[in-house]
Amino acid sequence: MRIREYTKNDLPFMTALWGNAFGDAEVLVRRFYELLPEMGTAFVAECNGVPVGMANVLCAVVCGQRCGYVYAVAVKPEVRGKGAGTALMKHCRRMFSRLCTLPASEGLYSWYADCLGADKVSCCIYETIAAGASDVEIKNLLSAEYAAMRSEYKLNTAFPLAWYEYQRELCRYYGGGMFRSGRSIACGYLEDGVLKIKECLGPTDFIPELCRRLGAEKAEIRTAFHAGKPFIAASFPLPETLNMCIALD
């Protein structure tokens, strides 16, 4: 098994593998890879010279230190269970001294702990708010505007502008976006009639009206909380106050 950094020639394979593994719209996957050079890099696993797997690693800053955020790891069905995924993760570990990720399912936390040493976990809780009408002012934000307002909150996480751009396009594709009301900001998308809010900073009193405008029955707001459900897994200690709710997921 050979692991190497991706090239543009790998993009058709990586785009197809992503779609088959995760079911995301091709237009979003293509946009991700357009932005990837500004966000980080990716690695490809080869078996006998044939690409069989991939792992994307994005740049993030956690508590003032750079780290790699592992995202959209996938291998072809015919090689699953043969070590391609583990080989990719071990390569990521060699290339980045500090790594974190959001496992796609609870069963993957132990796998990431084994192959990445990612045994430190942050947590979050989910709050539900019903839709309702009000005369509160709500504005759509561009990714740069959202990033600028987010920086005013002095959080312990930061990301490249391209990260916010991809977040915005993903959320807009699924009926949501990035919004502000007063000094509050929120980023989210629609899923089965629910506004899934990745992050809301500031008072949430505008959320009922935002739900109404977007046609959602209710909102589910993700908030960092040390005693909540497992969220980000990392190979380095995480503060209880870690706010990485805007993680790509």
Can you name each region flagged by the protein language model?
Residues 37, 43-45, 51-52, 58, ...:
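Core nucleotidyl-transferase/polymerase catalytic module
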Residues 110-134, 199-204, 208-249:
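Active-site/acyl-donor-binding loops of N-acyltransferases
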Residues 119-198:
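Amide-forming acyltransferase catalytic core, primarily the GNAT-like/NAT-type
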